[in-house]
């Protein structure tokens, strides 16, 4: 059959015009049409976020099919397996649609064949394709087609460590042993083992594997920097130019600053100020030295230049004008710090070259021996397979030609995340002019997987400058987000991203534009919000130790806004997504959302199975059974819900003997043979007896039964499986416990038997900071999503919260003793012995670690690459939102503006600032403050802790999937159902007379309140209808020295203090302080009493003053006893108590009571103690036969003292 020909540029222009004039609701853009139909040359499509790149790719493939190109003549590479599956689904749908409209039978037959061929076509990841090549042609390299992939990191580590150990031993005894030892020590620091060196070897090996030819890179590039940058003349010209530019920029910024209105140039007498003269001198010198550099210094004089600059500029980074600090000298300081010592560095740097050659030799030998071991095992890593495939195509012209002839077009999605191995594969498969590449350098966020955005960037610049090499098409219309999201994203990155940081200039060609009229509609309520927790408050810990965690207060801030969206704007939870930087350290979010009833599901990427509480409890149970002398595990088991020992119980057991293991202390307590056996109460003795019998049963059972049976015996004996089933997230918890039993069973089926081996395997996994995959359960549909920014790439969500924007970027790599560059090779910190330099004869050595010049150059390159990737990560996160975007962090409301008021450079934040800022928040606040006169389309709002109380946040009404009170529905056994039916009949009778049945002879007012609350409704509230949401709190006992104050102890001390104060007509602070010394309490408890509040009570409140005036009528700490009658049984009982104080007047009594409870709303305490105060009033009324009794609560537990009158 005859197919339609491919379109030429004129034909494409006609389609673009027709599309523009059509009445389609959603029109294709001219650039999309161009990307779909352009033919005959390489095409690079730079597709901004939400611009429809997948649509373009599918339409282009379909157009190829309709023009007679079979699906198996296309090579289509996707970034993930999931993306490949989605692409196939879309293609199937499109082909089916074309089948329905096809007019000829031949076309229908052809399209049907393509529909069938989709599943076997080359549509998938590069890893999958390279496996296919090696399976088919691996014989040319001697590779068996029946190989397996080494995906288990633990298995990889075992083989690698064995190879490394053997090779290390050989080098330690080889001819260069002395130099090798020096090499190892150079990377070991203060450590006395070679683990640090091993980590460096593995790092170099992994880096080399990301190149298209690891061996060639190691031989030709690895030492390039070390061999090149050996003296001043070898310093790259661009580095010198960069330094001179920084000098010019610093001078210009300082000049702009001195011209500011607030800058004080002259004194009152009209004479230039000392600061102004100093700054003018700095400007003059920096300009002069940079302009006449070659004449004054040259490359050989760089050290002198660095010293001259150091002498003329201040030691600090900032210049302060009108109270605002400007980091004018920060970048210049950073650039000259390494130059000042270059003479010394060059003197010793040469010594490191031989060591690096030795390292090169070691890594090459390791790579070869590791590969040979994998060949013996016939098991390979993905990188091995990729390199095999490249080798096959490079060394076999016929095979390469076969593929090049086969493929009409070589297509790749997410091109910005390609690494050099993948790029080489694409080059080998292409005929040189049939590549179609789709991507967006602004979304390149996989550098940690060795992706190199410069591959995309080089193509972009080449096609932009020379269209004959390929066609560059830019898709900038966004079809995802409302204008509020697009505008705020543009306003941020217009001032942030350029080629220096970000790798591309975010100009008009890259700015996002709404692709439809619907998106251009304005919704002022959806303006992007930066929500910041105000860290001016003392309660918030803003220390570096907490900088990676999302604080509970930040989580509350998010919860508050989500509850508002849900209740006030009817936003379903499933429309809301939280984005975080990493999969770990998100416990604060989970706990906070659980507390406020917000349903939350994670993306499934978190591997925290072994860290889930219920699994940790079981693992500690198994550890204790295996080895009872494991104190940590045993205490955890005792403290767990299985046995319920509290801290007091554990302390009583612990002091039975100081030196013994805890298990022996338990046994001493069991036999009552310890040093303090009198402290073992009958109740505790019963607990210990029960534990010892159960525990010994488990230990005996473990000797003769499988792990699977043991685990289920534990579940059944202590009802632990049922217990977790009553907790929040019950399905997940029970699934985790069930999976533990299954995994133990699978472990024993592999031939490994015994509890000890299973425990060692688990501990090994944890030791290597690994985990087992989480167990999947059916997740709620209407729930907030929590996922990483990386995981969210390519997805879209209506409401997006980007959390923890104040989290610092990880810069750990730039402090490593070894930094690698793809183009310059290795740079190291060299540890030189400078004893002779210092003429030091006493010490055996004076070791100094110095950053070699290759290290300094690589470090700067790596820092910029890291910052660029973080900037692109922020871009990806912000462009996920459809309707509204939130960015959440924490900062000081009073200090932030001064910190970020910068001088603009070419409509961008100064490069110095962008290089030194280390959080998303820094960038956002700096843009907002520096360009505050422009419309930036995002607001900054600070939230205080006072706005994050439970009252302000609110609560989502919890809903249960079943009625927990219906026991019949929650049991399967018919016997249990019948038994429950009988018991419930009895229970109805018992419940009616519950208070009488449980009634003691004597009770306190608080206990009476507790017993009779359900039926007497003392507080005026129907307690039985109150929904109480409980949370699990399983913590190990804290035996540290830090101690929180016991509220009961504090309350008792306050009451004693109030009794001891010598009352008079004028109580002074001295009287209160004197009384405090007489209080019988610990020093820490007395220190916690806020005597200022008590003094305020007597000096400022009406009640306090009146008590002093009527001091002769005052009664304090008055005991009473009162006979009461049970309304159900008619039995009489006695209520006893002590009244804090009252004034006995002629015709009335004024009753008052001190309360130290913490509170925010005093009305809550008023409601809580209504019943207790009523009992006190009743006792006084009966004693004195006075009807009028005024009741007051004196509340000491709030920020301020409150006196509340009771009804």
From Swiss-Prot:
Provide the UvrD-like helicase C-terminal domain boundaries: 508-794
Reactions accelerated catalytically: Couples ATP hydrolysis with the unwinding of duplex DNA by translocating in the 3'-5' direction; ATP + H2O = ADP + phosphate + H(+)
Q: Which cofactor does it need?
A: Mg(2+)
EC number(s) from the headed UniProt entry: 3.1.-.-, 5.6.2.4
Tagged with keyword DNA damage = yes
Annotated ATP binding lies at 47-54
Some GO term, biological process aspect, for this entry: which one?
double-strand break repair via homologous recombination
- GO cellular-component terms in the record? cytosol; DNA helicase complex
MF GO annotations: 3'-5' DNA helicase activity; 3'-5' exonuclease activity; ATP binding; ATP hydrolysis activity; double-stranded DNA binding
Xref: PROSITE patterns? UVRD_HELICASE_ATP_BIND, UVRD_HELICASE_CTER
Q: Would I find Nuclease among this entry's keywords?
A: yes
Where does the record place the UvrD-like helicase ATP-binding domain? 26-482
Q: Which UniProt keywords apply?
A: ATP-binding, DNA damage, DNA repair, DNA-binding, Exonuclease, Helicase, Hydrolase, Isomerase, Nuclease, Nucleotide-binding
Annotated family? Belongs to the helicase family. AddA subfamily.
Q: How does it assemble?
A: Heterodimer of AddA and AddB/RexB.
What's this chain's function? The heterodimer acts as both an ATP-dependent DNA helicase and an ATP-dependent, dual-direction single-stranded exonuclease. Recognizes the chi site generating a DNA molecule suitable for the initiation of homologous recombination. The AddA nuclease domain is required for chi fragment generation; this subunit has the helicase and 3' -> 5' nuclease activities.
Know the name of this protein? ATP-dependent helicase/nuclease subunit A
């Amino acid at each position: 059959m005859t197919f339609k020909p491919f379109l030429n540029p004129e034909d494409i222009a006609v389609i673009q015009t027709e599309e523009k004039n059509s009445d389609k609701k959603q029109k294709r853009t001219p650039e999309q049409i161009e990307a779909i139909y352009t033919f005959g040359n390489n095409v690079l499509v730079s597709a901004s976020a939400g611009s429809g790149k997948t649509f373009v790719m599918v339409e282009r493939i379909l157009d190829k099919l309709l023009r007679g190109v079979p699906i198996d003549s296309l090579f289509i590479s996707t970034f993930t397996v999931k993306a490949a599956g989605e692409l196939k689904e879309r293609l199937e749908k499109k082909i089916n649609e074309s089948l329905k409209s096809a007019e000829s039978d031949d076309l229908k037959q052809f399209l049907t064949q393509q529909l069938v061929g989709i599943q076997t076509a080359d549509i998938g990841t590069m890893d999958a394709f390279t496996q296919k090549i090696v399976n088919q042609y691996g014989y040319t390299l001697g590779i068996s087609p029946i190989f397996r992939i080494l995906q288990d990191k633990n298995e990889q580590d075992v083989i690698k460590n064995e190879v490394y150990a053997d090779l290390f031993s050989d080098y330690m005894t080889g001819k260069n042993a002395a130099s090798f030892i020096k090499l190892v020590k150079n990377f070991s620091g203060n450590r006395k083992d070679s683990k640090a060196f091993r980590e460096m070897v593995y790092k170099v090996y992994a880096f080399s594997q990301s190149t298209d030819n690891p061996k060639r890179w190691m031989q030709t590039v690895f030492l390039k920097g070390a061999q090149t940058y050996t003296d001043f003349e070898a310093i790259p010209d661009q580095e010198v130019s960069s330094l001179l530019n920084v000098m010019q920029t610093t001078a210009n910024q300082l000049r702009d600053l001195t011209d500011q209105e607030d800058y004080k140039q002259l004194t009152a007498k009209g004479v230039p100020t000392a600061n102004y003269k100093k700054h003018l001198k700095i400007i003059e010198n920096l300009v002069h030295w940079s302009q006449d550099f070659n004449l004054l210094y040259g490359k050989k004089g760089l050290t002198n230049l660095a010293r001259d600059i150091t002498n003329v500029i201040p030691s600090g980074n900032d210049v302060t004008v009108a109270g605002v600090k400007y980091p004018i000298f920060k970048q210049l300081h950073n650039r000259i710090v390494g130059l000042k010592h270059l003479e010394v560095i060059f003197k010793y740097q040469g010594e490191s070259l031989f060591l690096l050659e030795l390292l090169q030799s070691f890594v090459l030998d390791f790579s070869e021996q590791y590969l040979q071991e994998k060949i013996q095992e016939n098991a390979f890593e993905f990188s091995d397979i990729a390199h095999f495939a490249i080798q096959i195509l490079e060394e076999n012209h016929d095979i390469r030609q076969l593929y090049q002839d086969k493929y009409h077009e070589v297509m790749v999605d997410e091109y910005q995340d390609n690494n050099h191995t993948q790029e080489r594969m694409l080059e080998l498969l292409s005929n040189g002019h049939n590549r179609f590449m789709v991507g967006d350098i602004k979304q390149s966020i996989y550098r940690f997987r060795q992706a190199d955005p410069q591959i995309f960037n080089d193509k972009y610049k080449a096609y932009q400058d020379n269209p004959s090499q390929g066609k560059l098409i830019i898709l900038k219309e966004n079809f995802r987000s409302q204008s509020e999201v697009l505008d705020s994203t543009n306003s941020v990155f217009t001032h942030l991203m350029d080629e220096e940081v970000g790798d591309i200039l975010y100009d008009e060609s890259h700015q996002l534009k709404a692709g439809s009229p619907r998106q251009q509609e304005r919704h002022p309520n959806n303006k992007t919000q930066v929500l910041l927790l105000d860290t001016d408050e003392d309660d918030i810990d803003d220390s570096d130790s907490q900088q990676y965690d999302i604080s509970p207060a930040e989580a509350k801030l998010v919860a508050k806004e989500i509850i508002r969206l849900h209740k006030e704007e009817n936003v379903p939870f499933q429309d809301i997504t939280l984005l975080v930087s990493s999969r770990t350290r998100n416990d604060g979010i989970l706990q906070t959302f659980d507390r406020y009833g917000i349903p939350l599901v994670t993306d499934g990427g978190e591997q925290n199975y072994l860290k889930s509480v219920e699994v940790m409890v079981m693992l500690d149970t198994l550890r204790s059974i295996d080895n009872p002398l494991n104190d940590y595990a045993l205490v955890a088991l005792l403290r767990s819900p299985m046995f319920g020992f509290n801290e007091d119980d554990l302390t009583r057991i612990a002091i039975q003997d100081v030196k013994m293991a805890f298990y022996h202390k338990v046994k001493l307590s069991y036999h009552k043979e310890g040093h303090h056996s009198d402290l073992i109460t009958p109740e505790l003795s019963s607990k210990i007896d029960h534990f010892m019998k159960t525990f010994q049963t488990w230990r005996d059972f473990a000797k003769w039964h499988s792990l699977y049976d043991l685990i289920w015996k534990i579940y059944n004996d202590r009802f632990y499986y049922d217990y977790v089933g009553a907790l929040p997230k019950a399905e997940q918890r029970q699934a985790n416990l069930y999976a533990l039993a299954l995994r133990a069973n699978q472990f024993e089926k592999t031939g490994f038997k015994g509890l000890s081996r299973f425990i060692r395997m688990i501990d090994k996994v944890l030791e290597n900071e690994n985990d087992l995959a989480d167990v999947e359960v059916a997740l709620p549909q209407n729930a907030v999503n929590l996922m990483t920014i990386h995981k969210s790439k390519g997805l879209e969500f209506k409401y997006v919260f980007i959390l923890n924007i104040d989290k610092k970027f990880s810069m750990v790599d730039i402090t490593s003793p070894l930094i690698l560059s793809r183009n310059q090779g290795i740079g190291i910190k060299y540890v030189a012995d400078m004893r002779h330099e210092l003429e030091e004869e006493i010490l055996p050595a004076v070791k100094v670690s110095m950053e070699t010049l290759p290290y300094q150059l690589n470090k700067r390159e790596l820092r910029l690459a890291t910052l660029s990737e973080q900037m692109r990560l922020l871009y990806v996160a912000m462009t996920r939102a459809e309707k509204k975007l939130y960015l959440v962090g924490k900062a000081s409301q009073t200090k932030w503006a001064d910190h970020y008021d910068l001088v603009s450079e070419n409509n961008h934040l100064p490069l110095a600032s962008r290089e030194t800022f280390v959080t998303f928040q820094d960038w956002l606040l700096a843009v907002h403050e520096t360009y505050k006169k422009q419309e930036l389309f995002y607001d900054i709002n600070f939230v205080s802790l006072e706005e994050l109380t439970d009252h302000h946040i609110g609560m989502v009404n919890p809903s249960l999937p079943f009625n927990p009170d219906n026991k019949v529905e929650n049991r399967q056994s018919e016997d249990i159902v019948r038994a429950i039916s009988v018991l419930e009949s009895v229970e109805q009778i018992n419940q009616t007379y519950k208070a009488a049945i449980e009634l003691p002879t004597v009770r306190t007012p608080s206990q009476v309140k507790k017993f009779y609350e359900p039926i007497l409704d003392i507080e005026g509230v129907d307690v039985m209808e109150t929904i109480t949401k409980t949370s699990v709190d399983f913590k190990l006992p804290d035996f540290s020295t830090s101690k929180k104050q016991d509220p009961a102890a504090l309350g008792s001390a306050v009451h004693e203090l109030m009794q001891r104060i010598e009352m008079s007509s004028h109580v002074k602070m001295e009287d209160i302080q004197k009384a405090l010394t007489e209080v019988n309490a610990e020093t820490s408890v007395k220190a916690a009493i806020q005597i200022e509040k008590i003094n305020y009570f007597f000096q400022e409140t009406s009640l306090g003053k009146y008590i002093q005036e009527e001091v002769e009528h005052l009664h304090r700490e008055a005991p009473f006893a009162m006979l009461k009658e049970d309304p159900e049984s008619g039995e009489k009982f006695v209520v006893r108590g002590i009244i804090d104080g009252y004034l006995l007047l002629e015709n009335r009594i004024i009753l008052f009571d001190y309360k130290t409870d913490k509170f925010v709303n005093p009305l809550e305490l008023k409601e809580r103690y209504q019943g207790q105060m009523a009992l006190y009033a009743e006792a006084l009324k009966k004693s004195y036969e006075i009807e009028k009794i005024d009741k007051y609560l004196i509340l000491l537990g709030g920020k301020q003292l409150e006196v509340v009158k009771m009804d």
